[in-house]
Amino acid sequence: MARVSKQFLEAYKPLSTKELKDPVIFVVDMIEGFVHEGALHDEEINAATVHIEALIRDAEQRVIFIADSHPPKTREFNSYPSHCVIGTKESEVIQELQPYVQELMRKNSTNTFTCPDFQSFLTERMDSYRDIVITGCCTDICILQFALCLNAWLNEHNKTDQRIIIPLSCV
């Protein structure tokens, strides 16, 4: 088993928002269907809301919300119960974060990276940002898939000036 060195851990100390460089903040799936109601909601997710709100306020930077939004019949419902159907309250950003919605991308899978709007963002705007901050839910599926695919893309395209940041209190 690989061991993480002390030097490695020291390189990943907490950052303040003032240390962010040209950031974009992604808020993934902080929507009614995961936070407050629906087949896949978990009330504990709401604990991250105040931290996400503070990050957005303190950073005063570009914020992009990602919302799980499915047509009534979608392949994902073969694996998960029906949730976050387009046009329902479940697919809407939670009220607490509504004032911060600058841009909204809707996705029909667990992975933001595959979302057509995000693919456009990659080619048209990614180079405008240095720090990509990922917040939201759920860490074992949506956040993990997004971060891993984005990191692989950054590696493949040798984007050495960009970094992915996932604040622990915001997931």
Predicted feature descriptions by range:
Residues 1-104:
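Active-site acidic carboxylates
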Residues 16, 123-127, 153-161:
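Alpha-helix termini
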Residues 20-22, 60, 127-132, 161:
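A general structural motif
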Residues 44-47, 119-120, 148-149:
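Charged helix-capping and loop-helix junction motifs
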Residues 50-58, 144-157:
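Histidine-anchored nucleotide/phosphate-binding helix
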Residues 66-69, 108, 137, 167-169:
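Active-site-proximal beta-strand/loop segments in catalytic clefts of secreted hydrolases
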Residues 87-145:
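Internal catalytic-core helix/loop-beta-alpha segment
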Residues 133-140, 157-171:
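A short glycine-rich beta-strand->turn/loop micro-motif centered on a GG-aromatic cluster
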